[in-house]
């Protein structure tokens, strides 16, 4: 399992991020910290090694950026993803200078959170896979692309235009409805697993956006809705 530490002084936000982490296979939250002092105690003194840190910038009496040089000088092996409402160029520049692996601006979509963690894991595994790389492999590792990269809107293997058309036609007919994977899968009579693959692709194409809701049991449910500014793209796949 990949051990994640969440640093945020807002208890509700920290809990929400903890639940996000719990939804991604292979990741677990091993602690939360509301102060940098508590965070350093966990990072440097805990028996559990921290693989990934989710770091807020704006804290009540502290600035999360102050932790980055501490980690850098200590040659800490934990990687950092910033999750913050800080969107100014200076803060982002300082964060990147200290090697943060990703930067999410609040509020963010659940799919973007999942992309950040799984993308980081993919690069980490790739770095541990080989001792040497050729240029194409290095390009893929650093840029996430290659010289012959395909159109990101091309359907991945296993997805069919016919099924996509059926899903998009249903979504088009329910433009004002925020739906779950289970609801759509039942309506168009396909498996939940297959339906989720299409929905993830539509989110990656910016046709849909996601939000997360919690029922009385506390179980998170992802819900989807059309992004109005990209409605024309959805209509293309309805033909």
Curated annotation (Swiss-Prot):
Which residues does this entry mark as bearing 4-aspartylphosphate? 56
Alphabetical UniProt keywords: Activator, Cytoplasm, DNA-binding, Phosphoprotein, Transcription, Transcription regulation, Two-component regulatory system
Q: Where in the cell is it found?
A: Cytoplasm
Q: Recall the GO molecular function terms of this protein's record.
A: DNA binding; DNA-binding transcription activator activity; phosphorelay response regulator activity; protein homodimerization activity
Which positions fall inside the Response regulatory domain?
3-121
Q: What is its main location?
A: cytoplasm
Gene Ontology CC terms: cytoplasm
Instruction: Kindly give the InterPro entries that the UniProt entry links to this protein.
Output: 2C-system_Tx_regulators, CheY-like_superfamily, Sig_transdc_resp-reg_cit/mal, Sig_transdc_resp-reg_receiver
Q: Which Pfam families match?
A: Response_reg
Task: Extract the DNA-binding region annotation as residue ranges.
Answer: 181-200
> Might you name a Gene Ontology BP term for this protein?
phosphorelay signal transduction system
Q: How is it modified after translation?
A: Phosphorylated and activated by DcuS.
Cross-referenced NCBIfam families: PRK10430.1 (NF007750)
Role played: Member of the two-component regulatory system DcuR/DcuS. Involved in the C4-dicarboxylate-stimulated regulation of the genes encoding the anaerobic fumarate respiratory system (frdABCD; nuoAN; dcuB; dcuC; sdhCDAB; etc.). Weakly regulates the aerobic C4-dicarboxylate transporter dctA.
Name assigned to this protein: Transcriptional regulatory protein DcuR
Q: Which organism is it from?
A: Escherichia coli (strain K12)
The upper taxonomy is:
Bacteria, Pseudomonadati, Pseudomonadota, Gammaproteobacteria, Enterobacterales
